[in-house]
Each structure stands twice: as C-alpha cells, then as structure tokens.
Amino acid sequence: GDGGAVVTHDPALAERVRMLRQYGWRQRYVSDIVGLNSRLDEIQAAILTVKLKALDEDNMRRRAIAERYRAELQAVPVVLPGDPPGGKHVYHQYVMQCGGQRDELGRYLRQHEIGTAVLYPIPIHQQPAYAERFAGVSLPVTEKLARTILCLPIYPELTDEAVDSVAEAINRFYAK
C-alpha cells in the first residue's frame, strides 16, 4: 500500500499534520479542522519501521539508477528528471516527458517486457469530482504533461543490467 511520513522542525506544522491525519482532531472526537483517517495500522507501521532502516541506502540506489538512465538516454528526444535547484531528488518515480510518442513508446516497451506507468493521465481539474469547481478552466502545461509523461522502472532492487536493457530498448525505439 501507500504510506508516507512528514519530517519537520516546525512544531506548528507538526501539530497541523497530526490533526490532519486523524479527522482534524486536536483532542479525541473534536475536529478543529477538516481531516482524514490516514493513520498507519500496526502491520504497516511494523513494515515501515524495517524499511526506514534502509531508506538512505535505497535513496542512494535510486539516484544511481537515475544517473544511469540519464547517461544512457542523453541522445533521445525526451526530458529526463533531475535534481531541483537546491534539492536532491530521491526518484520515488522516474518520470520522463516523451512528447507525442508516449503511448507508442509505452507499447513498445511493454512488447519488450518492460513495465512502464502513466501516472495521473487525467488532470485533477478534468476529474468528474471537480467538474463543477473547475468548469471552463484550461491548464495547458498540466494537460500537456498528462499526455506526455511516462514512468520507467526504478526501485532499489533493479539491477544495472535491467536498467541497461530499459535504456537500450528506448534508444532502439527512437532510432527507428
């Protein structure tokens, strides 16, 4: 499943996050703000406790995979992710912009047994749940990204050989 954590030195932010995770409660059964039930159960917490011990190592491995993709895909007409100014990307996802050939590339990679994903193909402002609130809104950059992004495999256990296979397949696709 999905999970997450918030780390902060700001006591006010920490308090707000604690409230948001459990119905907006500052005290039991009193919702001071609108919140959700997004607490981890015991099993999820136990798994997270083990996984947190490997977080730095896993992040370093994903960064190494991203650097390998960057080195091997520099000749193809895609936009690859990188570190934000003043920051350090951990590559939870490896999202590249493929332009108008996203769907064709995705099919090609799947034909070569390479898993890909298209995350959030429908922008929030075009979701039925928000139709009334965002009626008539045009967000051309968001809409373009929804049509052009493709996620490549990236997880700590991915071997260098597998990364090379993904990159080779992408290079072959764009060479034809």
Regions found by a protein language model. Name each.
Residues 1-6:
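Glycine-rich phosphate-binding loop of ATP-grasp-fold ATP-dependent ligases
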